[in-house]
Each structure stands twice: as C-alpha cells, then as structure tokens.
Design a protein with these regions (language model features):
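A small/polar active-site loop signature that marks catalytic segments
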Residues: 1-36, 40-45, 49
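C-terminal functional modules
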Residues: 16, 36-177
Length: 177
C-alpha cells in the first residue's frame, strides 16, 4: 500500500464517523490524492481535485456488443454536501486508483465497500454459485488445501455457511452490494 492510500484511509474512517484523526474527510482525501500523484510523478493534481464535471466514461466493447455505461456520477472534486455513500464512493475510487496495480487490495476494497463501480460480468458461467452483480467474493479452497488440511477446510466451509464457492461471503463482507 502506498502513502497515498495510507492518507486516504483516515478519510474513509472520518467519512464513517470514526473521529479523532485531526482533520476532515476532505483534507485527508485531498492529501491522499496529492501523495498518489506525487508517488506516480503525475502532474495536474490541483486541476484534478477541482474537477466537478468528469465522471467515469462509458466502456465500448471493440469486439462484441457488451458495452457498458457507468451509473456512477462521482467526480474527483470533494463535495461536503454529498451523502455518506457518495463520499465513500469518492474516497474508495481514489484509493482504487492509488492502489493500482495491486489487484488483491482493490478487490478487497470492492468486496468490502462495493466501490468503485465495476463492469458486471457479461457471461456468468458459475451455475448460480456467484451473483453476477456482486461478482466473485472469495476464492474456493484449493485441491491441495483440501487434501493437506481437511479439518481446517471443513471448519472454514462450515463458517461460510457450508458453501465453498466463489459466491460465499467472508465474515467481513457484509454490504448488500
């Protein structure tokens, strides 16, 4: 996790009313974005943070007809008047960007918060074990783990409600989306 993400985390906590961090959600958010720009030698952070109009663009499938238009209208500029979910989406979207290319961290944030909005799976081949909108929630136990740690796997599957599937939610994965 880079420094930009470490700064964005207090913004997230502040947004969900964990107080005592010595700043506002906006100040932590903007500091995190600035650090991410600095770490990536990117220019234009002031214009980016002042941008109240740019929203996620539509995806055009160059091969098929699986185009997608994002419903998210979150912009880079902080909005003190936005509701909790809009502020959380803004924070996590920037954390997602700052974490690139750390895919597992981004996936964990998506599962934990539901943000940022991602393109849904077009062809779900899970035979109903994975919700198309929620997407993959966890990786099933491997064959080797099942062989070498049968009792641990059985205990884990029991804690998951008896399902060792990619759609089974982990204990911390409680959001409905």
């Amino acid at each position: 996790m880079d420094d930009g993400c470490r700064i964005v985390l207090p913004a997230c906590r502040r947004c969900i009313t964990w107080l005592g961090y010595g700043g506002t959600a906006k100040s932590f958010y903007e500091q995190g974005v600035r650090m991410s720009f600095e770490e990536n030698n990117a220019a234009g952070v002031d214009d980016y943070l002042a941008d109240h109009t740019s929203t996620p663009g539509a995806f055009a499938d160059n091969v098929g007809s699986d185009n997608y238009t994002f419903s998210s209208r979150v912009t880079p500029a902080w909005d003190d008047n936005a509701g909790f979910e809009a502020q959380l989406e803004r924070i996590i979207t920037q954390k997602w960007i700052a974490n690139y290319p750390d895919g597992p961290e981004g996936w964990s944030e998506y599962r934990r918060t539901g943000y940022p909005e991602v393109i849904p799976v077009v062809r779900n081949s899970s035979n109903g074990t994975i919700d198309t909108q929620l997407q993959v929630r966890r990786l099933p136990y491997t064959r080797d783990e099942k062989i070498n740690n049968a009792s641990g796997v059985a205990s884990g599957i029991s804690a998951l409600g008896g399902k060792d599937t990619g759609g089974a939610k982990l204990w911390w994965d409680k959001k409905s989306r």
